């Protein structure tokens, strides 16, 4: 079964979303930032992208459900006014429609047709004007069929996309008609690998990463970047292994932090599992509650890396 229509829609709305976030970033971000209960920053860009994306999905596939990160329960009115200003450049939605559109992302996931959105993954990177990504995936019963990542600050702006069974492509953020096929690296030895991880120490256990890379005899320093841009780096051969290491087993990864990147790496010939080598299960709701941490790789290095990761993290509770 083809999902060409879903892929075309995802590419189009991620491209526009990159324009929205770039526009927001051109303004001073300090007064546009809000701190959520989990202490991660939320920007006008997050809400603006979610409003726009949800509206476009709902127009085209009105019966589909959307699992997205943000909601409007605590959005201050001054922030919301800025959201409306940015959204209305690209949409004719009224203010009340924008609020309703943001809250279309409240699905609990699971069975059926679902879109999975992280409007700005790597908000701290966005605020630093470094790496962030607009992340959109489409799944049926937890099986990812389409994944698109927009990375506006990566090498002048890139979009990577995949449809299950059709490989992965990379586009300029300004041209989604002419993509080129991408593939993971063929690096055969861990001693030669380029390893990437999150910038923020709250997102991964960097001290354990250091132990793991020493065990694997990695000679290159880690490449640290925010967001699912790391999946893009693996899929395009710019890096060989990505580790996201939990500090304890109580933390549950959110599906919007991984859905698009997971498919793109796999379609580029790589492998993505949790730290125990188990496939990721997106069918259980808004979190990967049956998985712990992430290992993504070019496939060649996967088994050796996972074995060392399991050993180093064997005391996790």
Curated annotation (Swiss-Prot):
Matching CDD domains: PAP_phosphatase
Activity regulation note: Inhibited by Li(2+).
Localization in the cell: Cytoplasm
Catalytic residue positions: 46 (proton acceptor), 123 (proton acceptor)
UniProt binding sites for Mg(2+) 2: 118, 121, 257
Database matches in InterPro entries: Inositol_monoP_metal-BS (IPR020583), Inositol_monoP_superfamily (IPR051090), Inositol_monophosphatase-like (IPR000760), Inositol_monophosphatase_CS (IPR020550)
Protein keywords: Cytoplasm, Hydrolase, Magnesium, Metal-binding, Multifunctional enzyme, Nucleotide-binding
Cofactor note: Binds 3 Mg(2+) ions per subunit. Active also with Mn(2+) or Co(2+).
Gene Ontology cellular component list: cytoplasm
Stated role: Phosphatase that converts 3'-phosphoadenosine 5'-phosphate (PAP) to AMP. Is also able to hydrolyze inositol 1,4-bisphosphate but with less efficiency.
Entry similarity comment: Belongs to the inositol monophosphatase superfamily.
Name under which the protein is recorded: 3',5'-bisphosphate nucleotidase
Organism expressing this protein natively: Entamoeba histolytica (strain ATCC 30459 / HM-1:IMSS / ABRM)
């Amino acid at each position: 079964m083809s999902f060409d229509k879903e892929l075309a829609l995802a590419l189009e709305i991620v491209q526009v979303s990159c324009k929205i976030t770039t526009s927001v970033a051109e303004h001073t971000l300090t007064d546009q930032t809000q701190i959520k209960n989990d202490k991660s920053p939320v920007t006008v860009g997050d809400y603006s992208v979610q409003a726009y994306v949800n509206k476009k999905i709902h127009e085209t596939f009105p019966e589909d459900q959307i699992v997205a990160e943000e909601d409007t329960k605590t959005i201050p009115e001054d922030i919301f006014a800025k959201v409306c200003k940015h959204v209305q450049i690209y949409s004719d939605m009224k203010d009340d429609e924008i609020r309703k559109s943001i809250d279309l992302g409240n699905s609990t996931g699971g069975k059926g047709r679902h879109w999975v959105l992280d409007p700005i993954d790597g908000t701290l990177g966005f605020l630093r004007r470094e790496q962030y990504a607009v992340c959109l995936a489409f799944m049926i019963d937890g099986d990812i069929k389409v994944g698109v990542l927009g990375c506006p600050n990566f090498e002048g702006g890139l979009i990577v996309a995949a449809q299950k069974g059709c490989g992965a492509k990379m586009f300029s953020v300004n041209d989604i008609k002419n993509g080129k096929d991408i593939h993971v690296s063929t690096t055969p030895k861990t001693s030669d690998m380029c390893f990437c991880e999150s910038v923020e120490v709250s997102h991964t256990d960097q001290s354990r990463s250091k132990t793991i890379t020493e065990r694997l005899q990695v000679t290159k320093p880690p490449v640290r970047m925010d967001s699912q841009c790391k999946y893009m780096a693996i899929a395009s051969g710019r890096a060989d292994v990505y580790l996201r290491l939990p500090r304890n087993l109580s933390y549950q990864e959110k599906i919007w932090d991984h859905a698009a990147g997971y498919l793109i790496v796999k379609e580029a010939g790589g492998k993505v599992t949790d730290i125990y080598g188990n496939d990721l299960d997106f069918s259980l709701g808004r979190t990967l509650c049956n998985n712990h941490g992430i290992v993504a790789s070019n496939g060649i290095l996967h088994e050796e890396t996972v074995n060392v990761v399991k050993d180093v993290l064997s005391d996790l509770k």
